[in-house]
């Protein structure tokens, strides 16, 4: 199993800040206590998982991975939205594995109120998020406890596998492949909201979709080690503050605010608007500006402009003197951040695929 960075747990341990009120000093004090205790809490979790699962077996939620522990952490479910694979495994008996399979197949799409840090079942939803992304052994949709239970029983009887942990414990598990176009199915789910925000901010919907795919693979539970939250991976303390300021609000969006799909897509798209009309204003070629916006969504507008010149105005002049293809090449080869270089490549490719689908 891939070992994920323990700091991905941080956002689950405390909420993001809110607007300034007469309670702000109390909040700041509580926040400080939370951060001081963070190393202890994450260390305890890591130690607990290492004790139960062995070394190099720590698995936590991230941008494109949903992970839920149950059964006192002896059973866990992992959805890789990038790879299109669902792995459910247990060190307990098969009853716990069967229960975990049913719950992962029928989980909802609302991340609010779901504590991925705790060991407990996620409620079964009447509108499962994975409907249309997974089919059962008969080729049918999995929409309720009957179909999920029947499929779970089939998996236990026909697809059960075992592996040995480094601590000597035996794990029983099943791997459920998602359908080939699972990403497109998730994208379709959020298309009405994307179109709404595209109209609101006069933004190309294919750009919004390309960023969403690259940021989270349309995982509504997405969270990163940098505390970026939700479908468009908005960081409350940076982009979030800018967005709230633009909207005439104080403070920054909360975790629950950004786990709301509509508010998250609104926040991400409004940040694109800020990049286009404020931070990167002055770039005249629309294609060059789009490349700069994509790169800036990942690394910040200042970092993008400094690739061309330390002075902002000079950087704008330099960009305007280049063809879009040259801007693209420079940002994908000379940006100091490898992540930013790859980010532009990925988003541009994803955006092209959504333009074709239209």
UniProtKB/Swiss-Prot annotation:
Gene3D superfamilies: 1.10.530.10. Murein-degrading enzyme. May play a role in recycling of muropeptides during cell elongation and/or cell division. It is an enzyme of class 4 (lyase). It comes from Pasteurella multocida (strain Pm70). Residues 1-15 form the signal peptide. GO terms for molecular function: hydrolase activity, acting on glycosyl bonds; peptidoglycan lytic transglycosylase activity. GO terms for biological process: cell wall macromolecule catabolic process; cell wall organization; peptidoglycan metabolic process. Its main location: membrane. The gene is mltC. It comes from the Bacteria. This is Membrane-bound lytic murein transglycosylase C. It is found in: Cell outer membrane. Its EC number is 4.2.2.n1. Pfam families: Mltc_N, SLT. SUPFAM superfamilies: Lysozyme-like. HAMAP family: MltC (MF_01616). It is a lipid-anchor. One of its GO terms (cellular component) is cell outer membrane. PANTHER family: MEMBRANE-BOUND LYTIC MUREIN TRANSGLYCOSYLASE C, SOLUBLE LYTIC MUREIN TRANSGLYCOSYLASE-RELATED.
């Amino acid at each position: 199993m891939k070992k994920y960075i323990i700091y991905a747990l941080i956002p689950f341990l405390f909420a993001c800040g809110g607007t300034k009120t007469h309670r702000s000093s109390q909040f700041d004090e509580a926040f400080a206590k939370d951060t001081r205790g963070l190393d202890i809490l994450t260390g305890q979790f890591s130690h607990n998982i290492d004790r139960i699962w062995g070394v190099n077996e720590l698995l936590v939620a991230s941008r494109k991975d949903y992970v839920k522990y149950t059964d006192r952490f002896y059973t866990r479910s992992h959805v890789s939205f990038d790879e299109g694979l669902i792995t459910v495994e247990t060190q307990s008996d098969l009853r716990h594995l069967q229960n975990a399979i049913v719950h992962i197949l029928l989980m909802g799409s609302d991340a609010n109120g779901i504590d991925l840090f705790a060991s407990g079942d996620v409620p079964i939803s009447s509108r499962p998020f994975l409907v249309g992304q997974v089919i059962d052994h008969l080729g049918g949709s999995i929409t309720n406890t009957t179909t999920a239970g029947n499929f779970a029983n089939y998996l236990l009887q026909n697809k059960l596998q075992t592996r040995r942990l480094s601590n000597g414990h035996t794990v029983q598990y099943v791997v459920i492949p998602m359908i080939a176009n699972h990403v497109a199915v998730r994208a379709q789910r959020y298309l009405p909201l994307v179109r709404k925000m595209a109209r609101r901010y006069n933004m190309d919907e294919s750009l919004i979709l390309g960023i969403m795919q690259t940021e989270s693979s349309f995982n509504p539970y997405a969270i990163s080690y940098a505390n970026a939250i939700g479908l468009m991976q908005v960081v409350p303390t940076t982009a979030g503050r800018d967005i709230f300021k633009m909207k005439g609000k104080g403070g920054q969006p909360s975790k629950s605010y950004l786990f709301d799909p509509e508010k998250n897509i609104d926040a991400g798209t409004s940040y694109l608007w800020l990049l286009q009309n404020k931070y990167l204003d002055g770039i005249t070629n629309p294609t060059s500006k789009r490349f700069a916006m994509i790169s800036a969504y990942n690394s910040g507008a200042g970092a993008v402009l400094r690739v061309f010149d330390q002075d902002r105005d000079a950087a704008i002049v330099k960009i305007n003197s280049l063809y879009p293809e040259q801007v693209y090449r420079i940002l994908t080869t000379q940006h100091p951040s490898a992540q930013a270089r790859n980010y532009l490549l990925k988003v541009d490719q994803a955006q092209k695929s959504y333009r074709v689908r239209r």
